[in-house]
Regions:
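Feature of Fe-S/electron-transfer and energy-metabolism proteins
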Residues: 1-194
């Protein structure tokens, strides 16, 4: 394995950001424990295989071969909204579907993946109002996520996507900018325990 340098890490981050910036069709299936218990991995497998049966190109990694028109299937981390799972998010529209079941998958493929339309009955509803997008839902709208800002939006199994979204930046700073003493002081000053 080649030596890790700041330049190599920076180049990898730039490449991954470029791949991530493209306005492509993405299907993010929550792979948090609550959603998995509700069947999200079966939903992921079914959606991906059914799209392939219909002749649609699919991919499961940020870096791939086969063209930019491939549908990117992702297993995301927990969205923090477990009682509404299994959750499914479709990009670029940003639709967030709740309580998704296997029986919903064919309609999702037809209406959303192929047609770009929301399946209204799967959108989050509160007091008679349906919310199409994650950031519109009152539960999320009042939150200011810092450490978990990418939770539910990233492929939990793709390290390049993690790096593109700033992953390892603290490690990079510690490795290339700080002394051992500064690292120890920052950790002690942070008050972290455990």
């Amino acid at each position: 394995m080649p030596e890790l340098t700041r330049e190599r890490l920076g180049a990898l981050r730039v490449q991954a950001k470029e791949l991530l910036a493209a306005d492509r069709r993405e299907v993010l299936v929550c792979a948090g424990t609550g959603c998995i218990a509700g069947g999200s991995l079966k939903i992921y497998d079914y959606l991906k295989s059914e799209c392939e049966k219909r002749g649609l190109k699919t991919r499961v990694a940020l870096r791939h071969e086969g063209g930019d028109d491939a549908i990117h299937f992702k297993k995301s981390g927990c969205h923090g909204f477990c009682e509404m799972g299994p959750l499914l998010q479709i990009e670029p529209e940003g639709f967030l579907y709740t309580h998704v079941r296997l029986e919903d998958c064919d309609e999702i493929i037809e209406r959303t993946i192929l047609g770009g339309e929301a399946v209204e009955r799967l959108l989050y509803e509160l007091n008679g109002v349906r919310y199409a997008k994650h950031n519109e839902i009152p539960f999320y709208a009042k939150q200011q996520r810092v450490v978990l800002e990418n939770c539910g939006t990233s492929d939990a199994e793709d390290i390049e996507e993690y790096i593109a979204k700033g992953g390892y930046s603290a490690f990079e700073k510690a490795l290339f900018e700080m002394t051992d003493e500064e690292i120890c002081r920052d950790i002690l000053d942070s008050g972290l325990r455990g």
